[in-house]
A protein has these predicted regions:
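Acidic/His-leaning functional-site neighborhoods
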Residues: 197-280
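Hydrophobic, proline/glycine-rich low-complexity stretches
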Residues: 25-112, 225, 281-282
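Catalytic strand-loop segment that frames the active site of acyl-thioester-processing enzymes
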Residues: 30-71, 150-156, 161-164, 170-230
Length: 282
């Protein structure tokens, strides 16, 4: 028999636990949230795909290191090559929700590199794609994880991952389930001391489906790295896409100042369209 007082005590405990958990979230920062992401090891069993390429002139900084926007393009390219090689029923209608890039060592201009990609986990409407960029001798240079959401072509709303794709990815996913919750949530952003500046859009920022391309967001992170030469490998960069940026809009960068790392929201009016963090990865 459960006494009334026992129920009251339990309810009070549950309320306090909920408040405690809420307080923990409130105390977190963009940095804490970004570094909490666990980059899974691999590749293990199951399908993996490898492509080799060279760091070319337009991919590198004047000092010769591979830029992060180039990394984002490489990730897109090898993902697309993999889906075509595996003959997915729907290789096109996927959008990136989040990209996490861990740089152990920056590839250099004219260096040959291998990109190996595999599935790190599956959800009902999305999948995590893990990619490792390595030197040709096998030395890991960059690890990345991108959360790709499958969308309906007509409505652009999330749609279930096709059965044939699940069958292809299941072995490498190893039973790992992933969710699409944001890491860099709005309430974690430090609003106390923010600098703002416009981010003018270019025609070249938009891709074949009319989206501001993932690589274009990483250009914003590169601007930070150009001004902070002390932030180099090992580093982590996180870019999350919340609301699509449309042609003709006027995005504004909101940057929390006074930090050694980048803490940024890209907003149009009061709406957060993207969130970014970049800093040293201890």
């Amino acid at each position: 028999m459960v006494l009334y007082t026992d129920v009251c005590i339990f309810e009070e405990y549950r309320k306090r636990l909920g408040q405690y958990q809420a307080d923990i979230v409130t105390l977190m920062s963009f940095r804490d949230a970004a570094l909490s992401f666990q980059m899974i090891e691999g590749p293990g069993s199951g399908r993996q795909f490898t492509a080799r390429r060279r760091v070319r002139l337009g991919d590198a900084t004047p000092n010769g290191r591979l830029r992060l926007d180039s990394v984002a393009r490489y990730l897109q390219d090898v993902s697309n090559d993999d889906t075509r090689d595996a003959d997915w029923s729907d290789p096109h209608w996927w959008v990136v929700r989040r990209t996490v890039i861990d740089v152990h060592q920056f590839p250099e201009y004219m260096q040959e590199i291998d990109l190996t990609t595999w599935c790190g986990g599956i959800g009902s409407h999305w999948a995590e794609r893990r990619t490792r960029i390595s030197a040709v001798d096998g030395t890991p240079l960059i690890d990345a994880a991108s959360l790709w959401v499958h969308v309906d072509e007509a409505t652009m709303q999330p749609s279930k991952v096709p059965t044939d794709v699940v069958d292809i990815l299941s072995a490498s996913a190893g039973g790992r389930d992933v969710n699409a919750r944001l890491l860099l949530r709005d309430k974690l952003f430090n609003e106390s001391n923010v600098n703002t500046s416009p981010w003018p859009l270019r025609f070249a920022d938009f891709d074949a489906v009319g989206h501001m391309n993932n690589a274009a967001y990483c250009v914003i992170v590169e601007e930070f790295l150009a001004a902070h030469r002390d932030v180099r490998a090992p580093l982590r960069a996180v870019v999350e896409h919340v609301v699509q940026v449309e042609p003709g809009q006027d995005p504004v960068r909101h940057i929390a100042s006074g930090n050694a790392d980048l803490e940024l929201q890209l907003r149009v009016g009061s709406t957060m369209h993207a969130a970014m963090w970049c800093g040293l990865n201890p």
